[in-house]
Amino acid sequence: YYIRCQENNRMKNKIFELYKPKSLADFLSFKEENPKENFVYVLQHPPANINILGASDFGYLVICLPNFGPDSQIIFSSSPFVFKMQKNLRDVRQQDYILLTGDPAVIGISCAIVSDYTSGKFNLLKWDRREAKYYPINFDLYQKG
């Protein structure tokens, strides 16, 4: 049992970048062929000096937006951005994870979109600097009590 659990929690070695047409097609095909796999939706590709591979312990990494550089402001016109993120996050399920990276506006809008798609139940990954690892945080926004 321990070995099986350890194997199931091992790093996933595929990374999908939804902003690249071939990678998007590969993701859609892989997701259809592997419906039980979990995915970690990385909202924006992190800078080169930040390693997010530890998040792959929770599922295959799915990067929604490229890294636009440190001086870039992503949202000047909100409608096209909201449409793009609705498209990128449309396959997210309650068992998947969201890795909050990038512009705070990207994070805020994306969490709202994910909440709409999952009826307020979703998982985030939080980085713990002291332990140097990710911890899952489960949300149920409409929970009574």
Per-segment meaning from a language model:
Residues 102-109:
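Elongated alpha-helical scaffolds
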Residues 1-2, 27:
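Aromatic (phenylalanine/tyrosine) cluster motif
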Residues 11-97, 109-145:
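Long, low-complexity, Lys/Arg-enriched
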